[in-house]
């Protein structure tokens, strides 16, 4: 299965957001790190900041709404947005995920990331 996902450039992720501070950690598979253009040894906190800092500013609210909707519902939520790749390209991303845990300390989301502008 991993070979199939890697072959079609689908990156998997798990995000942990501290419910008190709002700080996030982005845990990724190898394909996701490749899509983000980051090294394998990046920390989850650095990875989250990297992803967040390269979001297109005009679409930040759409992504924030997706995160809020995932936290509030028990359904899978999807959003498409431009993302500024470190190699200089702006790519269109389809992100799909769901909330898998929420308590007083942490909110956990899981999902996938796919660059769709390369079709």
Question: Residue locations for each model-derived region?
Answer:
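PAS-family sensory domain signal
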Residues: 1-50
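PAS and PAS-like sensory modules
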Residues: 11-14, 65, 76-83
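Residue-level signal for short segments within beta-strands and strand-turn junctions
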Residues: 14-17, 85, 115
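PAS-family sensory domains
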Residues: 19, 26, 77, 82-88, 90-91, 101, ...
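PAS/GAF/H-NOX family sensory domains and closely associated sensor/linker modules
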Residues: 39-42, 51-62, 68-75
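Short coil/loop residues immediately preceding or within conserved phosphate-binding loops
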Residues: 46, 76-78, 95
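Short loop/turn elements at sensory-signaling interfaces that couple input to output
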Residues: 90, 95-118
